[in-house]
Amino acid sequence: LSQTLGMEFLSTPEPDTCQARMKVDERNRQVFGFLSGGATLALAENLSGVGSMALCPNKICVGINVSANHVKAVLEGDTVTATARILHKGRTLHVWHIEITNSAGDLISAVDITNFILNQSKK
């Protein structure tokens, strides 16, 4: 999904954070030329999943809750940057806050995601 939508994962700016960017183009915009809300959520959920997997290698991390507020539209041609910060790092739950901004640094979406951390099953 990340390749299909054009996500690019970036180096981590500080501990317990992760960052990615995505150019708004025909892969992730809706018919009016704006970034799709679904693509925005996919960016946030992929980023929080990558963050949880980095914190818990050898575990399975699955999203169990997503809450978002889209506060500003982004037109095709712009690039959005998502920065995820972990709010809670428990044994079985991670709570992430993701802020997505446009190239001017304006807030586009604020997303909160809860990931459930599972042990890998033994076969």
Language-model features and meaning:
Residues 74-76, 81, 85-123:
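HotDog/MaoC-like acyl-thioester-processing domains
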Residues 3-5, 16-18, 37, 60-66, ...:
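A generic structural signal for short beta-strands and their flanking turns/coil linkers
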Residues 50-81, 86:
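Hydrophobic beta-strand-centered segment that forms part of the acyl-chain substrate-binding groove
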Residues 22-24, 70, 117:
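Hydrophobic residues in beta-strands and at strand termini
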Residues 32-49, 53:
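Compact, glycine-rich, soluble single-domain proteins
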Residues 4-35:
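Catalytic strand-loop segment that frames the active site of acyl-thioester-processing enzymes
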